[in-house]
């Protein structure tokens, strides 16, 4: 199964421990299919979604539409995880480009990537 970045899938995330999202819920595939195809294990990197609004860049809003979502949903960037592809129960559709950008911005913030978190080093002057 080859899933593009931004694909919305229905996954069974149980079992989990602690505060991890559990149960059957929509999730966004954020791993690159070209990289995943060459890996030893059949894993996807995903971001779970919820219907409960969150504040800030780690919880971008995702509207109903071509993604297959039927109501306003919110990505839970801080619940990023890898799952086996066998957990996929259904494929819905793709996020709109602006929604995937918002997810990518949240991932960059959460993982410490990007210009706003990693300024260019100042050249050393002797």
Q: Where do the model's predicted regions map?
A:
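Conserved functional hotspots at enzyme active or ligand-binding sites that engage polyanionic ligands
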Residues: 1-126
